[in-house]
Amino acid sequence: MSGTILENLSGRKLSILVSILLLCQVLCFLLGGIFAPVPAGHLTILGSLCRENHARQNDTNFFLYSRGDGACKQVTSEEVDADALKLANQIVHVFQLPLPRENKILEYTRWQQNLIGVLQVEFGYDSSPELHEPAKELQLTIDMRLAYRNNDDADNDWKLYAHSVEHRYLDCDTSHIGPTETLYTCDMIPLFELGALHHSFYLLNLRFPLDSPKQMNLQFGHMHDLTLTAIHQNGGFTKVWLFLKSVLFPFVVGIMVWFWRRVHLLQRSPALLEYMLIYLGGALTFLNLPLEYLTLGLEMPYMLLLSDIRQGIFYAMLLSFWLIFAGEHMLIQDSGNKSTIRSRYWKHLSAVVVGCISLFIFDISERGVQLRNPFYSIWTTPLGAKVAMGFIFLAGVSAAIYFLFLCFMIWKVFKNIGDKRTSLPSMSQARRLHYEGLIYRFKFLMLATLLCAALTVAGFIMGQMAEGHWKWNEHIEIQLTSAFLTGVYGMWNIYIFALLILYAPSHKQWPSMHHSDETTQSNENIVASAASEEIEFSHLPSDSNPSEISSLTSFTRKVAFD
């Protein structure tokens, strides 16, 4: 009789295995909750005002900076207000990051991986009744120049990283109405995104050119305060994350080699579920591969895009596996033909493929372009923002629908098992106990699958959040978000690790004569038990589907002969 380790492993050994895996799961949660900081940190920087040097206005290799030798002389708000034209086309807004702390110069490290900048704009206009409610979707033209230097460079040795003239659309509300001027505060707008944080210091120069013939920036009056929020991945979290990947990677590779070797020792071709398990293990191995170590020595601005692709491949493989995993255990065989993806699951998997391709197109349309222009964002235009929100909304709805459909499939599996259990009393006692044990173990595994799917959906939704923390975890020692992320990541590895063990072919199917010289007394008992069970089933006709790996899937045929 065909069998897997799940079916033939003793209850004591199975309990020990499950206990070890649960302990590893707890350790993954504790690793993120106790040792890792929140995944992301941020700096809030109020822009400094510097007067433009008209002789070098178009020189993209000239930068104004606010700290260090040769820093610009900053312009005060009183000087701006005193000028009739508010120093139009003479002001440069300067952001130098990171900020010093306690008179100590801080610098970015490559462990922080990436940097995202968002900008909040406040502008003023002469008070007038018709201007109290500004028009929606105001277009702002910004000349952006981003520079960098390293800790061994001179204070004035800034090098151009990127330059672009971009348009941003503002949604503003009145914040203060004065006797001579009305102030408006606008929603945050995306400014730039760096896929690699390779340098120590960064400098941002923003200009807001005024041009009457082109009607450029004329509807804003003059700028007041500009606030830049720079969001970076915490280096401490990156170290914990890479430690987790480095530990899990060799274990998954080792169990895949062990699993595939056992499959090939059988005198049959691998079953569909065995192929799916090895594909799933391969996708997880690709995700576990700690490529982020390369960013410590190389500048890899495409690492964010590569990480999204790796995670997308894993999600696609995991979602596909769950559908096939549940479908293969429906206990309904329409024909004796071997199950294939094309014949039985193409409708289910086509939805997963379409969804993953849609998300890939959305991702490549933004982060792919950002490799050339870090100031580009699909969120900058009203239409682009609506399309992006639509993609995220559809992704969330699709994830919820998928989870409900998976719950329905698992419910059908449980229902079919319940229907077939009515045939157990007519069986012999040995076989009845055998199948009751299989059903109990299988139900436990399916519930674990459902829990893994639920946490995966929750993790996917959390991954779409702009901020990497929850408001209620700011004053407690355990970082809930970090614990959740490392816990879910560890859960994927532990779950797939367990499947590769439990669905590997069992040793009890192998002829005992090949190992007679090494067999102990306990093993002889196992072989004798297996032999007696084989005699009990010997009157059954040969299985028409020799590729089945679980006796549960052949339960319906064998019941008829008891």
UniProtKB/Swiss-Prot annotation:
The chain crosses the membrane at residues 16-36, 240-260, 271-291, 312-332, 345-365, 391-411, 442-462, 483-503. It comes from the Eukaryota. GO terms for molecular function: Wnt-protein binding. GO terms for cellular component: cell projection; early endosome; endoplasmic reticulum membrane; endosome membrane; extracellular exosome; Golgi membrane; multivesicular body; neuromuscular junction. Its main location: membrane. Coiled coil: none annotated. It is found in: Presynaptic cell membrane; Postsynaptic cell membrane; Cell membrane; Endoplasmic reticulum membrane. Residues 37-239, 292-311, 366-390, 463-482 are lumenal. It is a multi-pass membrane protein. InterPro entries: WLS-like_TM (IPR047843), WLS_GOLD (IPR053936), Wntless (IPR009551). Pfam families: WLS-like_TM, WLS_GOLD. GO terms for biological process: compound eye morphogenesis; cuticle pattern formation; Golgi to plasma membrane protein transport; imaginal disc-derived leg morphogenesis; imaginal disc-derived wing margin morphogenesis; intracellular protein transport; positive regulation of protein secretion; positive regulation of Wnt protein secretion. Residues 1-15, 261-270, 333-344, 412-441, 504-562 are cytoplasmic. Residues 541-556 have a biased composition (Polar residues). A segment polarity gene required for wingless (wg)-dependent patterning processes, acting in both wg-sending cells and wg-target cells. In non-neuronal cells wls directs wg secretion. The wls traffic loop encompasses the Golgi, the cell surface, an endocytic compartment and a retrograde route leading back to the Golgi, and involves clathrin-mediated endocytosis and the retromer complex (a conserved protein complex consisting of Vps35 and Vps26). In neuronal cells (the larval motorneuron NMJ), the wg signal moves across the synapse via the release of wls-containing exosome-like vesicles. PANTHER family: INTEGRAL MEMBRANE PROTEIN GPR177 (PTHR13449), PROTEIN WNTLESS HOMOLOG (PTHR13449:SF2). Interacts with wg; in the Golgi. Interacts with Vps35, a component of the retromer complex; wls stability is regulated by Vps35. This is Protein wntless.
